[in-house]
From Swiss-Prot:
Function text: Catalyzes the hydroxylation of ent-sandaracopimaradiene at the C3alpha position to produce ent-3beta-hydroxy-sandaracopimaradiene, an intermediates for the biosynthesis of oryzalexin D and oryzalexin E phytoalexins. Catalyzes the hydroxylation of ent-cassadiene at the C3alpha position to produce 3alpha-hydroxy-ent-cassadiene, which may be an intermediate for the biosynthesis of phytocassane phytoalexins. Catalyzes the hydroxylation of syn-pimaradiene (9-beta-pimara-7,15-diene) at the C3beta position to produce 3-beta-syn-pimaradiene.
Topology versus the membrane: Single-pass membrane protein
Tissue distribution of the protein: Expressed in leaf blades and sheaths, stems and panicles.
Record's protein name: Ent-sandaracopimaradiene 3-hydroxylase
GO molecular function: cytochrome P450 dependent ent-sandaracopimaradiene 3-hydroxylase activity; ent-kaurene oxidase activity; heme binding; iron ion binding; oxidoreductase activity, acting on paired donors, with incorporation or reduction of molecular oxygen, NAD(P)H as one donor, and incorporation of one atom of oxygen
The protein's required cofactors: heme
Induction comment from the UniProt entry of this chain: By N-acetylchitooligosaccharide elicitor and methyl jasmonate.
Ligand binding (heme): 454
GO biological process: diterpene phytoalexin biosynthetic process; ent-kaurene oxidation to kaurenoic acid; gibberellin biosynthetic process
Residues passing through the membrane, by range: 4-24
EC number(s) from the headed UniProt entry: 1.14.14.70, 1.14.14.68
Species, as recorded: Oryza sativa subsp. japonica
Length: 510
């Protein structure tokens, strides 16, 4: 979910440049903008920009995390940029990021969302709602009902079936055409989406009647609307976010796209919820997030709208972040046959001829290192969702004024040569030294830190690690010829631009 939020924030910055023609033409209106606050005694260094637009023109390459990291080489781990009328403090080191997320959390606990995300999420989803009573209640519910340790135990069988289905499909495709590369993403995302539906709604929905559409829609269309269209809408941008004093100007194309996406998402989610409420009314209780939320005591805490948004978030998150992590891991494994062999031998020694399960994970240190190294090099969230400084505070010795936006550049934290040797290389061995603990999720910033740590970190590790282990245990992986340098990402997200195509060879029985 958070990768979608970051995509939206980055996209808005780029699209704002396109809106500068209108802004420049209406420069006489700029006097309506509120005067900036008086500079504090010791502000962070500022990246030089242009009048009115600030640094927006420098972010047009659509990889803001890389631009931010480059600037940190000149201006240090903390600096200020201007995105139109908005000052933004960018943090580029783990040390400063943890200071903000843990030590200074009370001053920097709210979210600052672009217009598209405010409309789509209504600030009711766990990942982006402001810290407070509602956010704590919603996070507690998703931890107890779906993502926490005990909840994950009850969904374990579902996860195991999902991974077995992936392997069964891959074996079938290889047997039909052993010499052609196959598209791993197509196979994996289909089963991953089924898992997210079962966990969230209690069943792998094949179709649902949507009253607003006047027809039955298929599972593929459900996926397109709830996952694909939501991701694409997140990169739609409203330049008015960066020029709030011009908010009275129309942006009809943006408003149409967002409202259409919102309408379609709401219609399908409400149809899915209606179907499950009818099941529950018949006394057919199941282990699922919706069954948990609809229990009387918890149901009274939520409006129908909040229920719909929380379930939408749970479906999207499972089908997004885990895909990014697993696909990049298998890309690196296929690209590095020596490391693939090390992992395979570890699995053989630890598990013999038995299929890897979640119980085996503590006995597979190299597998855990592979997982953490992939999170470091290919973080699902290159830049964490923007936060809002609501009280004057200090960071790294600099004064930060209330009203400032703050962005944490996870990419720069993970590419810091002062912390990571040869950070551009994929080297799981770096996580096997004395300085690293497998259980320490804060060695990378991929799951955030402090009170806003990602709620889905345990599920991501359970699914990705077992999937990777089983995939290597049963199949030998080799990249399609010419794909060894295809490491670009899709727009502002961490999703691999080119779906992973691989040659697979079944291994002999162990």
């Amino acid at each position: 979910m958070e990768s979608m939020l970051v995509a939206g924030a980055g996209a808005a910055a780029v699209a704002a440049v396109g809106g500068l023609v209108a802004a420049a033409a209406l420069a006489d209106k700029l006097v309506a903008a509120p005067p900036p606050r008086k500079n504090r005694a010791n502000p962070p260094p500022a990246v030089p920009g242009l009048p009115i637009i600030g640094n927006l023109h420098q972010l047009k390459e659509k990889k803001p995390h890389q631009t931010f990291a480059k600037w940190s080489e000149t201006y240090g781990p903390i600096y200020t940029i201007k995105t139109g009328a908005s000052p933004v403090v960018v943090l580029n080191s783990t040390e400063v990021a943890k200071e903000a997320m843990i030590d200074k959390f009370s001053s920097i606990s709210t979210r600052k969302l672009p217009k598209a995300m405010s409309v789509l999420t209504r600030k009711s989803m766990v990942a982006i709602s402001d810290y407070g009573d509602y956010q704590k209640m919603a996070k507690r519910n998703i931890m107890i009902g779906m993502l926490g340790f005990n909840a994950q135990k009850q969904f374990r069988g579902t996860r195991e079936r999902m991974i077995s289905n992936v392997l069964s499909t891959l074996h079938k495709l290889v047997s039909l055409d052993p010499h052609s590369p196959l598209n791993f993403r197509d196979v994996y995302i289909n089963e991953l989406f089924s898992l997210s539906l079962i966990q969230s709604l209690g069943e792998d929905v094949s179709s649902v009647y949507v009253e607003e559409f006047g027809r039955e829609i298929s599972k593929d269309e459900i996926f397109d609307v709830l996952v694909h269209e939501m991701m694409m809408c997140a990169v739609e941008a409203d330049w008015r976010d960066y020029f709030p004093y011009l908010s009275w100007l129309p942006n009809k194309s943006f408003d149409t796209i967002v409202s259409t996406t919102e309408f379609r998402r709401d219609a399908i989610m409400n149809a899915l919820i209606k179907k499950q409420k009818e099941r529950i009314a018949r006394g057919e209780a199941r282990a699922s997030y919706i069954d948990f939320l609809l229990e009387a005591e918890r149901s009274a805490q939520l409006t129908d709208d909040q229920l719909m948004l929380l379930l939408s978030e749970s479906i999207l998150a499972a089908a997004d972040t885990v895909l990014v992590t697993t696909e990049w891991t298998m890309y690196e494994i296929a690209k590095n046959p020596d490391k693939q062999e090390l992992l395979y031998q570890e699995i053989r020694e630890a598990c013999g001829g038995e299929a890897v399960t979640e119980d085996d994970l503590p006995r597979l240190p190299y597998l855990n290192a592979v997982f953490h190294e992939t999170l470091r090099l290919h973080s699902p969230v290159p830049v964490l969702p923007p936060r809002f400084v609501h009280d004057d505070t200090t960071l790294a010795g600099y004064d930060i004024a209330a009203g400032t936006q703050m962005m944490i550049n996870v990419y720069a934290c993970h590419m810091d040569e002062k912390v990571w040797e040869s950070p551009g290389e994929w080297s799981p061995e770096r996580f096997l030294g004395e300085g690293f603990e497998v259980a320490d999720r804060y060695k990378t910033m991929a799951f955030g830190a402090g009170r806003r740590t990602c709620a889905g970190s345990l599920q991501a590790m359970n699914i990705a690690c077992v999937a990777v282990a089983r995939l290597v245990q049963e199949l030998e992986w080799r990249l399609r010829e010419g794909d060894g340098d295809k490491e670009d990402t899709m727009q502002f997200t961490a999703l691999k631009l080119d779906p992973l195509h691989v040659h697979l060879k079944p291994r002999g029985r162990m």
